[in-house]
Regions:
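Alpha-helical metal-binding/catalytic segments enriched in His/Glu/Asp
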Residues: 94, 103-144, 233-239, 245-271, ...
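N-terminal capping segment at the start of a domain
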Residues: 11-52, 399-400
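Zn-dependent metallopeptidase/amidohydrolase metal-coordination segment
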Residues: 28-38, 92-96, 297, 367-421
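Active-site-adjacent substrate-binding region
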Residues: 29, 37-38, 176-227, 265-270, ...
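Midchain, well-structured core segments that form catalytic/ion-binding scaffolds
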Residues: 142-143, 147-310
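A short beta-alpha structural unit
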Residues: 46-50, 281-290, 302-308, 334-353, ...
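His/Asp/Glu-rich mid-to-C-terminal helical/loop segments that flank catalytic regions of hydrolases
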Residues: 227, 245, 249-274, 317, ...
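A non-catalytic alpha/beta surface segment that caps or lines the substrate-entry region
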Residues: 40-85
Length: 434
């Protein structure tokens, strides 16, 4: 599945498809508004995976399928698959996710799912329920990893890169294990690997997503082709010192675990700034005993590092580890590292990148190519050799993962039209070169 034939005649070939399968972007906007009103509060979206609100969103989405000639089911990893059977078993998959971070935005993930639903709907109408190739839409389970720190849960199970033994004992802030949360949603953790069965006949994967950054707005461009996703190293780091009374312990006698962690939090900034596309974040800090009258005896932190270059990513990680040991020594503490998750940089398929470029230019008149810093399910799909590409739509003020997340509604409409064109072009290539 790793090769797609690409020829200069593809634009002419796909023009016939563009006379059909017309999407209605306003339907996508109405559905987005409806989902927001159903699953958000004054703080933002609350569709955190493995929670009642997430299940409510999925039940709402199931209602949207009742008028379509699609089969739908949940696989062993709780990914929701919708299939519009075609004349051929060769399959185009469109995917994204309905889950959100706590207090999240109204577009992250769900835009791709609802745009995909509209593309499926349009093809079903124009081909009387049976397009030339099979089309599938997938709502991946727990893309965000917000509750347990394990991103891309469902798509990594699909790709065969997820080992549940390393994750079943992960806990959320309330102490609930990942295994217990999954069981509460009807998922048998020992059967998650069976999700790989869904790979059969998939020849390409497409995903539409908001940019979640400031670049497109700065360039005054509505849409972009995504070149690939950055590699990620995600670690839990714990500094161990000595709890002591804050009033009676001299400064020179303290073994302050938080002081060591704070030094590392500052040090990762210059480590990342050495490289133009690198980022590093310490996004979580827990102190123990966590009271105002005690020196911190234990400090638990997380580190997230990303870059497109695997060598640079490894160098950054090495420098961060060395710095943590140095700062632990300075504060007379110890430090331990525990890996949460990692993924290598993933380039997307060059032929699909070209088709995506064409679809964007034909829709918006101008395009851009960007790497993706945020993680996406598309990376897990691409890493197993399925030709993959993503399309970005501009984010306002570069904000995401909070209630201020927004995109110009006209740009959303353009994105839906361009994404539909991309699906048409992909199938057009297959029609010419089956």
């Amino acid at each position: 599945v790793a090769t797609m034939k690409r020829h200069s005649t593809s634009i002419a070939i796909t023009s016939a498809f563009e006379a059909f399968a017309m999407v209605d972007p306003k339907t996508v906007l109405r559905n987005l508004d409806e989902l927001r009103s159903l699953t958000s509060d004054e703080h933002g979206a609350q569709r955190v995976a493995w929670t009642p609100v997430w299940l409510k969103a999925r039940a709402w989405f199931e209602e949207k399928l009742k008028s379509l000639p699609v089969e739908h089911h949940y696989d062993s990893a709780a990914n929701h698959w919708m299939t519009l059977k075609g004349e051929s078993e060769k399959t185009l998959v469109i995917g994204s996710h309905l889950d959100s971070v706590p207090n999240g935005g109204w577009l992250d993930g769900c835009l791709g799912v609802l745009a995909g639903l509209e593309v499926l709907t349009s093809f079903a109408k124009e081909y009387n329920g049976k397009p030339p190739y099979t089309m599938r839409l997938v709502d991946w389970a727990d893309e965000e990893g917000a509750r347990f720190g394990r991103s891309l849960f469902g798509s990594s199970a699909f790709a065969g890169s997820h080992t549940i033994d390393a994750d079943r004992v992960r806990t959320d802030r309330e102490g609930t294990t990942l295994e217990a949360a999954l069981q509460g949603c009807g998922v048998d953790v020992d059967r998650i690997g069976e999700s790989c069965r869904e790979q059969k006949n998939i020849a390409a994967y497409l995903e539409l997503h908001i940019e979640q950054g400031p670049i497109l707005e700065k360039l005054q461009k509505p849409l972009a082709v995504v070149q690939g996703t950055k590699g990620v190293e995600r670690w839990a780091i714990t500094f161990h010192g000595q709890e002591a009374h804050s009033g009676s312990t001299p400064m020179a006698a303290r073994r302050d675990a938080l002081a060591a962690a704070a030094k590392l939090a500052l040090e990762i900034r210059p480590i990342a700034r050495k490289h133009s596309q690198s980022v590093a974040t310490m996004g979580s800090v827990k102190t123990f005993p966590g009271i105002v009258t005690a020196v911190v005896g234990r400090c638990e932190t997380t580190l997230d590092m990303r870059d497109l270059d695997a060598g640079i990513l490894a160098e950054m990680l090495r420098e961060a580890r060395e710095a943590s040991e140095r700062f632990a020594g300075e504060e007379r503490c110890s430090v331990e590292w525990s890996k949460i998750w990692s993924i290598e940089p993933i380039p997307f398929h060059p032929d699909l990148i070209q088709l995506c470029e064409e679809a964007i230019v034909e829709t918006a008149g101008v395009s851009e190519q960007l790497p993706s810093g945020p993680l996406h399910d598309a990376a897990e799909v691409a890493r197993i050799g399925i030709p993959t590409v993503m399309m970005f739509v501009q984010s306002l003020n570069g904000l995401s993962h909070n209630r201020a997340e927004d995109t110009n509604r006209a740009h959303i409409e353009q994105a839906v039209i361009a994404f539909n064109r991309l699906a048409q072009k992909t199938i057009g290539c297959w029609t010419q070169h089956p």
